[in-house]
Swiss-Prot record:
CDD domains: AdSS. It comes from Citrifermentans bemidjiense (strain ATCC BAA-1014 / DSM 16622 / JCM 12645 / Bem) (Geobacter bemidjiensis). Pathway: Purine metabolism; AMP biosynthesis via de novo pathway; AMP from IMP: step 1/2. Mg(2+) binds at residues 13, 40. Keywords: Cytoplasm, GTP-binding, Ligase, Magnesium, Metal-binding, Nucleotide-binding, Purine biosynthesis. It is an enzyme of class 6 (ligase). Its main location: cytoplasm. This is Adenylosuccinate synthetase. Substrate binds at residues 300-306. The active site is at 13 (proton acceptor), 41 (proton donor). One of its GO terms (cellular component) is cytoplasm. The lineage of its organism: Bacteria, Pseudomonadati, Thermodesulfobacteriota, Desulfuromonadia, Geobacterales. NCBIfam families: PRK01117.1, purA. GO terms for biological process: 'de novo' AMP biosynthetic process; IMP metabolic process.
Amino acid sequence: MANVVVIGAQWGDEGKGKVVDIYTEFADNVVRYQGGNNAGHTLVVGDEKVILHLIPSGILHEGKRCVIGNGVVLDPEVFIMEITKLKANGYLKDDKMLLLSEALHIIMPYHKRIDIAREKKSGSKKIGTTGRGIGPAYEDKIGRRGIRLMDLLDEKAFTRKVKEVLEEKNLILTQLLGDQPFTFEEIYEEYMKYAETLRKYAADTSLILHQETKAGKSLLFEGAQGTLLDVDHGTYPYVTSSSTCSGGACTGSGVSPREIHEVIGISKAYATRVGSGPFPTELEDETGEQLRQAGREFGSTTGRPRRTGWYDALVARYAVRVNGLSGIAITKLDVLSGQETVKVCTAYNYKGQVLTEVPASLEIMEQCTPIYEELPGWNDDITGAKSMAELPKNARDYVARIEKLSGAPVVLVSVGPRRDETIVLRNPFELN
């Protein structure tokens, strides 16, 4: 039995959903522990494409319990839409296999309206929010003004708490942001309907996960976004509002750090970023567009084109350090097929100074230019490769170089979007 955390080792969109889908076969429980429906996991099962924003990817596997932990902020409407669609497609046959932490926070309609209005008002200083109310919901959580699932399920508590905050929210909307206010009645009517559906999924998930570990059952923690978007360790303020690093798996689920055995970081064979913020290896030329089209780099949540660039070994080393990565999974290696040469950033140039680690200062990082190591590319179609030996030598050398520069072993290589287009080098659920 092993408990494994899967996190993004870059700026999100690394292919975590596919890796989690593969690892779910070995797990008894799949746990989502942070973020909200600003995340989008795209899975390809056979010829079927499934996009999930809230519910853990493990839901596609019958007999696996899926848990949405206390660290998540949940939009009830989106959650209900997802379970409705999943059931219509033959998934989630047993409601008991999907649990919501009673302590998770609820995204309210004023969160979404504030989020959108603020972004419009930001002008050139936009963060790149998805406008789904994630940030404002976390603000209320930290400010001790949040509405938790347990509040939503208690009509009196819900009424009291919403009335306490609504006057302030309406002042922000009307006086500061020039938007429309809400009435308590419209919120109450909408959210009491949601409560009827959510009630059957609510549970003390921290206790249940504790009981599962004591019974020898395994846990797989499914992270959203990526390390460089972490609210503490990312490129602040161009970050998300939650703890995307491995430590967030414990605080966002109520599982002890002593119960974590492996942390696997997911990293594309190149790099992408959505929204604003520093991106030292960004390619704004024909090569960047080639990577965008070949990798279909458009957000599964927003549809926005992603910024593309070469692999950044400094970012990889940083992710290894702050997450304690025991392994790296490389995705989309196939996208690099056809490139005459491939590049890896091994250092930054900052005003003539060579930096070998990611700088803490955003202002410094914004002025860094990449120092590249160039490796020969390959033309072969590698999507059919079932082992490293079946890859072209140059592709193997590229993976080996990533491994050496990052400082963590490569445990999986994805050579295509399908579940079976994967080379598994080590299974983290098999403890030595």
